[in-house]
Amino acid sequence: VPLSPTQLQEHARRLALDHRLDSKPPRNTQLLDRLERTRQWVHQASSDLFEASRLEESVTPAAEWILDNGYLIEGNARDVQLNLTRRFCQELPVLAGGSYRGLPRVYGIAKELVSHADLRLARGHLLAFFEAYQSARALTIGELWAVPQMLRTALIESVQDLAARALTDQREGEIADFWANRLLTANRRDPNHFFSILAELAKTQPSPSPHLATQLIDHLYDEATALVPVQSWLERTLGQSLGDLNLREQSRQTQEQISIGNGFTSLRQLALLDWRKIFERLSRVEQVLRLDPAGVYPELDFDTRDRCRRTIEEFSRRSGQAEEQVAQRVLDLATKAGRESAEEERRSHVGTWLVGEGRREFARLMECREPLRYRAVQWVYRHHSAVYFLAVGFFSALALTLIVGFGLGAESFGVQLGLTLLMLIPVSQLALEVINYLVTRLLPPRVLPKMDFKESGIPDAFRTLVVVPMMLVDEETIRTEVEKLEIRYLANRDENLLFSLFSDYTDAPHLQREDDARLTEIAVQH
């Protein structure tokens, strides 16, 4: 039943209070399996409706929507399957009871929103619904990231229900067409045979649907002698007048047309929303971290903030505490560190404890042991030079030992020593290549935290000079480099972003050349 915006928010709060999570959820992927079955079913239904349209059979308005927009279902289903991996889906909190028992909680929320909003998902209503839900119970970071995919899934399944009704209407229309032709033929040739066919129809369709009834009447409308007995049978069977029945059927088809139109429109609108901004507005963890005592966190770029949030997820999972509680502990730790050591401003920044040098201490305070892989990688980072050169040396020694031992075993010691020295350089080069390859494949890149001043501009405290090196070769080179510098400046207009050239002369046999002063003057003038 469609609800008003206020009713939707109240419904969201009731949902949050009613939902119970499964403490030991089954690690299944039935949601993804359902989505694949839905996608295949809608594809087949679209094919059936297209075939009916090709044969010039009448179709309902809802069926026309499916024929014109069926590709949206296919594309959105593929997008969900691509982004909602099985592993990620298995990590989402699962409901312990109710209509969506055994399914992710965020999926149940999405289904409720879609069904009670009549498939119409405006950005404001969406935000209000999830904020109302979280006023009673917070969602996890993973659940909030899954919201767009769950909304798409809920919309696809709702469109499937409407497509099933449209397909049923289509088949009932074909049945009505079949019986109407038989009744009309009998009425024109042998009126006595007409009633035997009507009796056969009553036996075959003991409880005709309203759509079948209205379609049958439409076919018989111009044949009064056939219409009257059929109308009498239908009114007696359905218990209402055909006028009322026709009004109800028209109302149903109109409502289904509106609903399916809303569904396809919402699928398009979901693709246009900035889900990063929506996520950060809904995330309780984000709201806590933005209280960073150093005031740095809100100025970080999105990827760096996301690294901080992922760390919160990891500690929450290993400690068994809620993500919001973990974020609050980070905030408290940063606040305390800022008061105790005012000269070390960086310790009052929450990022220091999540992605910086304070992470080990925070893990100890949380009584969370870091995963073995993470500890191993951090150990390698701390001893990078020793690890690198020892690995190169070990691989070189191993390769030389194998070559000498198996290839030169019968030679004298002097020959072996001489050949070993000759092969030392190529073998060490091979070792460098192998170790460099392994480093790039096994060690994740160390991404530096970044600031984002795209909207506010670079503040005075971060005034920056970009220095571009160049050689004073000749006048043409200077002119080209100055033009490039001008392009960089025009492409990055900011009062606190400056550009300069760092120049030097080319190599020469003497300390000074005749044109040094001229080239310098040209560079300054330009």
Question: At which residue positions do the language-model features occur?
Answer:
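ATP-dependent phospho-/nucleotidyl transfer catalytic cores
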Residues: 2-103, 128, 132, 145, ...
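Secondary-structure capping and boundary motifs in well-ordered enzyme cores
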Residues: 65, 95-105, 125, 147-155, ...
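Active-site activation/catalytic loop segments of kinase-like enzymes and analogous catalytic loops
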Residues: 75, 102-144, 151-168
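Active-site-adjacent "gating/activation" loops or surface patches in catalytic cores
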Residues: 78, 82-89, 98-112, 364, ...
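Secondary-structure transition/capping motifs at alpha-helix termini
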Residues: 119-122, 136-140, 406-415, 460, ...
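Alpha-helical bilayer-embedded segments of polytopic membrane proteins, i.e.
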Residues: 152-162, 374-436
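Juxtamembrane/interface segments at transmembrane-helix termini
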Residues: 167-168, 408-410, 430-453, 479-482, ...
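Internal catalytic domains of large membrane-associated glycosyltransferases
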Residues: 187-313, 317-377, 446-526
